[in-house]
Amino acid sequence: ACMLGGVAAWLRWRKKRQAQGKPFDKPNFVISTGFQVVWEKFAQLWQIEMREVPLTLEKTTLDPEEALKMCDENTICIVPIQGVTWTGLNDDVEALDKALDAYNAKTGYDIPIHVDAASGGFILPFLYPEKKWDFRLKWVLSISVSGHKFGLVYPGLGWVCWKGKEYLPEEMSFSVNYLGANITQVGLNFSRPAAQILGQYYQFIRLGFQGYKEVQYNSLQIAKYIHSEIAKMVPFVNYSEDVVNPLFIWYLKPEYAKSAKWTLYDLQDKLSQHGWMVPAYTLPSKLEDYVVMRVVVRQGFSRDMADMLLGDINNAIAELEKLEYPTPTRMAQEKNLPVEAKMFNHGGRRKTVKK
């Protein structure tokens, strides 16, 4: 879905450049360093430069002014994210749209916005209907969202919507008549299962707007509860005080980490032994020294399960704090060496993953 939105922006830009008799061989797009890997794939596969706006502890979401500094006549779009994979936060699309409107008026460009709402797209309409991040904004021309995240459908289903048919280039539509009728399709692959689409359609009909609202509200409340309990634990500090989506991250307090004999990779290892998949990872560039852990709360994760998770975290901390010597991951961190985190698969066998 992200790739289709990106390709459409690229083709629209290329067509305009061709009509103006201008070069069209150096396209670029602007996104924060909190991007999901699909955008890196898009950049490499279509040979489009990806200009990254760094995230910092002071600026935890995309800074509109910094994004505009990276734009030029070759910019095909700016990509704000709703539900950043790394942090769970939302970029301020309304502020970006306002700043971009002034920028486009000043420069004569017509740089659009593609919203990557992979996670937040199925949260915002139900829990924050007043928030403007969608087609109510002037420069938002396309939105992508994952049905298999908070859309409550099994993998892998993605949706992309355009503000109007005129923003979907004709070159992206392909028709065939050898299947018994004229069939037109927009996509990167032609043959694919319809099970996920049927699953999404079923959920829409079965749950309706109110049903989705209740499911997402419950997930968010559970996430906020875990967030508040994590904040009470001595070793940890939450990355953000806000929980706007049912996912958030935390890290070790710097003063605690200095004397700790363990790392969050060790906590991940301990929790995996109890069946919890709570990943530890480093943040993107400019923040790569921070190792964080992330919790994602989905439908069916109850308050009882949250208490079980919190209990296992507390028990794991108690075990780790009894260590007499530093763990291998702690020693590796001190020597600035690659960290080898331990993971358990369903067969009970341990495997090593380099971080």
Q: Which residues does each predicted region cover?
A:
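Structural signal for hydrophobic packing residues in well-ordered secondary-structure cores
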Residues: 13, 17, 50, 100, ...
